[in-house]
Amino acid sequence: ALFGRDEYDYVDRRTAMLLVQHFLGTDWQGQLRVESGFAQDRDVRPRWAESPLPLGSPFRDNRPATSGDYWRNVVTFEWRPDVALEFLRPGVGTKLTYERADGQLRYERAEGRFTVRQNHGRLALGARLDVGITSPTAPPQQFFELGANQNLPGYDYKQFAGDQAAVLRGQVYRGFGIFGAPLRITQRVWLPPIAPGVALSVQAGYVRASTPAAQATVNALGSEVTGHVRSSAALTLRF
């Protein structure tokens, strides 16, 4: 932010939670977490409109949020959290989350994430599906948002929002097979390998407002529903 690049907006949230976690499976591949505690959300305005240095662009305004105190309960099940599109480990991973809030802010929210990745030599294939649903009357900060920095590149920042959403992402990565060894600087200092490669990624997302109340929240956020499946693709060089 000091250099004028702050591409996100924020909610002032404070929590005091108790967490209990239990590992599952012989190799602790699964995790079951239960969280419960007090939370407080506050709608805040940015204190700075832009960086104090004459660099970059003005900061984003924070999107509308409903202030309130509430008791938050979360149950999360994860299987193979080490399997992700961003990592090289192959396999199948799953994450299921249920969240409930009671108090000045009230809502229920459920999310599911399913990831698969396979490596074949220098070729890596991966896919990830995210689905979610929240209460139509949930505060705006609990709605699902899609856009440039939210798993749907090629569209505006948080262009789409709603109380029901799904995003499917696929990726094909091909390494060039060069510069794959770590770089030795000194006897004790090594740098990771450059390992260049090319990646093709495809994203498809859908979000809707299930009730007039949900649509009113989408309008207040300055977003829109997708209306139909929106997609984008990118070809990038990675190191």
Predicted features along the sequence, with ranges:
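C-terminal transmembrane beta-barrel domains of outer membrane proteins
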Residues: 26, 72, 90-239
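Transmembrane beta-strand segments of outer-membrane beta-barrel domains in Gram-negative
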Residues: 1-126, 205-210
